[in-house]
Amino acid sequence: MAAGKIRLGMVGGGRDAFIGAVHRIAARMDDHYELVAGALSSTEEKALASAADLGIDPKRAYGDYRQMAIREARLKDGIEAVAIVTPNHMHAPAAKEFLRRNIHVICDKPLTATLLEAKSLVRAAERSDALFVLTHNYTGYPMVRHAREVIANGDLGDLRVVQVEYAQD
């Protein structure tokens, strides 16, 4: 591992998962993180294959995020942060598992599926010594930043309607 880089784990984001690749690209561009562990799929076979694709040591490839949280928290060189890029309904349970072990959490949006889950996650974050961060990944795109600046400056006048299309393959 490169000196000074944050040891990152990832939950979700394995083969055929769109948003995991986006987070990995951002982590590489930022150059402050190194992906060293993962529970990259809900099926063990696919999780291990995805980890192999990404060059993760097989001993740090997990078929279950709970096993990953437990083991990584005990390792001297365990992950310092985890990116949660699972399907939306899994954000809260996975995040709480890592917060319980004082591992920093970077969670993709949305926060949770329900207000009750959100309140439970807030309590877990308050009890933890770790940070919880919710990403809104497109806010950092140059095109989005430019649009925000143009609107804030009033360059387009008073907006009455905004129509946006989002194409994703």
Q: What is the predicted role of each segment?
A:
Residues 112-169:
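A contiguous active-site-proximal alpha/beta segment in oxidoreductase catalytic domains
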Residues 33, 59, 80, 103, ...:
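Short, well-ordered coil/turn segments that N-cap beta-strands
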Residues 33, 42-44, 92, 117-120, ...:
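Catalytic cores of eukaryotic secretory-pathway lumenal/extracellular enzymes that build
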Residues 60-124:
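Beta-loop-alpha module in the N-terminal Rossmann-like domain of NAD(P)-dependent dehydrogenases
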Residues 26, 30, 53, 97, ...:
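Alpha-helical structural signal in soluble globular domains
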Residues 38, 82-83, 162:
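Receiver (REC) domain switch-region micro-motif
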Residues 1-56, 77:
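N-terminal Rossmann-like dinucleotide-binding module
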